[in-house]
């Protein structure tokens, strides 16, 4: 834990830019396939961000796409003053329309692996889950629905517990990660 007196507050100015909810796509790799992750130190004017992710030879990113409004990332700060507990729990809920064998198999594989995840949100920000420790599945569902208008889908929740909110990727690093996504 850092010295609390050494943490400088800087304030947050009002942001007039539009902000859109939701996620566009996700890149996932096995945790064991990550060779290095380079984190910039940041400065008085900039926050630390991930500037490079190097995979081991033969390793690759796998890409996941969703219907609009069907998936989300929630980052929750958990603090207990009495015990000194302070961590961030990030939950990525990915929902895939239509129950099919290939999707069932992929959900099952995700549930068993230790992974890292890059989430592209609707504001073109890229969140890195798995910096401190592997991301793992914490829940999942498959549902047929009851009526014609009900959802028929698979859903999986991937969880990351970390000391901080997930680091964002630099635009160049994000471009490299998603460069092979068709």
Task: Map each language-model feature to its residues.
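Oligomerization/assembly interface segments of phage tail-like spikes and tubes
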Residues: 80-101, 150-164
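Short acidic, glycine/tyrosine-flanked loop/strand segments centered on an H-E-D-like triad
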Residues: 89-96, 121-142
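Mixed-charge, glycine-accented linear interaction segment located at domain edges/termini
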Residues: 133-182
